[in-house]
């Protein structure tokens, strides 16, 4: 199990990403707009840099919903490989079974 503080940190990052998503997207649109003036683009860059670091989506880490494990995460299930295997062996994931050939 991951530490509770790490889970809380990820939850805080998720809130920040949601809060600043529109503002961040608008600033990036201005920066990539070739028709905008250099001054507007530069101001957008400075404003983007002044936003909280954790408001960037790339700072988030996918974690297992049950254990909080950061590695071996499977997006399709939202779980780590270990928990997916346990659930599969119990038959809790429909249509998923152990491979044999």
Curated annotation (Swiss-Prot):
Belongs to the universal ribosomal protein uS14 family. One of its GO terms (molecular function) is rRNA binding. Binds 16S rRNA, required for the assembly of 30S particles and may also be responsible for determining the conformation of the 16S rRNA at the A site. Keywords: Ribonucleoprotein, Ribosomal protein, RNA-binding, rRNA-binding. The keyword RNA-binding applies. Part of the 30S ribosomal subunit. Contacts proteins S3 and S10. The keyword Ribonucleoprotein applies. GO terms for cellular component: cytoplasm; small ribosomal subunit. InterPro entries: Ribosomal_uS14, Ribosomal_uS14_bac/plastid, Ribosomal_uS14_CS. This is Small ribosomal subunit protein uS14. It comes from the Bacteria. Pfam families: Ribosomal_S14. One of its GO terms (biological process) is translation. Gene3D superfamilies: 1.10.287.1480. Transmembrane segments: none annotated.
